[in-house]
Amino acid sequence: MDRMDSSDEEIDNISDDELQSGDEIEVESSNSPLRLNYILGNEIGRGAFSIVREATSRATGTKVAIKSINTRFIKNKLLMREIEIMKKVGDHPNILKLYEVYETTKHLHLVLELVTGGELFDKIVQRGEYSEQDASKIVRQIVSAVGHLHANGIAHRDLKPQNLLCAGEEGDDIRVADFGLSKIFGDGDYLETCCGSPEYVAPEVLECKPYDKACDLWSVGVITYVLLTGCFPFWDKNNAVLYEKIRNVDYGWPEGLEVSNEAKDLVSHLIEKNPEKRFTFEQCLIHPWVTGEGVSNARKIKPFQQQQPNNR
């Protein structure tokens, strides 16, 4: 389902998913600073206005990813904000690192940490099955990254599986990515932009009420539910019906699916309509299911079955 971007604040980002033909992104000339410092390799990804290539540092031999963005289509202020945020929080082990930025008249080249495992849920599907212990480890890393963002005055606002990358082939070393909708805020500040991906967005955002960083913890709750069940807690082909289910927190657990009480307890404190009652990242990090102490490791989860939850 498409992302929602509507408000008093114009939204754009540098992480578009779909390819558009037309304006190709030219690689800089051989004597450009970028080429002098990096050996460019194969294309490994492409967005509407960007190309990602694998590259190697001439100085250190380190493998990196270089994202080249055609700035003709991107609002410079928002792009600069995304870069500022990535520089500010990239010292966390579970946040995708931005090493350098090269700017020309037509393009921005972002030198990024190279992650080779792909998107989190694609990796899980490849594995075929996993345990609550595996899910707990993944959620623990996501919450740790979210905590680092919040401690630095940043709300991500678009946490979803597509923005969770695997650093390696095993799929258990997570990086939070895509800060195109992220926002810097101060203590006591509220946000107003209605944005995010519908299945993962908090009810206060849908209702266009002032909201804060607690919206990210709702998204963590939805991600956790999907990890545990293989389906969304809120789902309908009709957006209006979907939004109503989210506003009413109308969800249940699939019949016949064994989920530990500790896991259900965590989800219930994250998928909580009142943001003031919703768990903070600090509360999540000490929850028994997140620490691993209250995790059931007996049941193997088969991800992404076609079943839908038994909504109450």
Curated annotation (Swiss-Prot):
Gene3D superfamilies tied to this protein? Transferase(Phosphotransferase) domain 1
Active site positions: D158
Q: How is its activity regulated?
A: Does not have a calmodulin-binding domain.
Q: Where is the Protein kinase domain?
A: 38-290
CDD domains for this protein: STKc_CAMK
State whether keyword Phosphoprotein applies: yes
Which InterPro entries does its entry note? Kinase-like_dom_sf, Prot_kinase_dom, Protein_kinase_ATP_BS, Ser/Thr_kinase_AS
Comp. bias intervals (Acidic residues): 7-27
Question: Where is the segment annotated Disordered?
Answer: 1-28
The molecular function terms in GO held by this entry are:
ATP binding; myosin light chain kinase activity; protein serine/threonine kinase activity
Q: Which domain of life is it from?
A: Eukaryota
Give the main EC class. Answer: transferase
Question: Reaction catalysed?
Answer: L-seryl-[myosin light chain] + ATP = O-phospho-L-seryl-[myosin light chain] + ADP + H(+); L-threonyl-[myosin light chain] + ATP = O-phospho-L-threonyl-[myosin light chain] + ADP + H(+)
| Biological-process GO terms, alphabetical | signal transduction
Please list the residues that bind ATP.
I44, G45, R46, G47, A48, F49, S50, I51, V52, K67
Q: Would you tell me the Gene Ontology cellular component terms?
A: cytoplasm
Q: Does the keyword Nucleotidyltransferase apply?
A: no
Might you give the EC number(s) for this enzyme? 2.7.11.18
Q: Which UniProt keywords apply?
A: ATP-binding, Kinase, Nucleotide-binding, Phosphoprotein, Serine/threonine-protein kinase, Transferase
Family classification: Belongs to the protein kinase superfamily. CAMK Ser/Thr protein kinase family. CaMK subfamily.
What is the role of the protein in this entry? May phosphorylate a specific serine in the N-terminus of a myosin light chain.
* Xref: PANTHER family: SERINE/THREONINE-PROTEIN KINASE (PTHR24347)
Q: What is this protein called?
A: Probable myosin light chain kinase DDB_G0282429
Q: Which organism is it from?
A: Dictyostelium discoideum
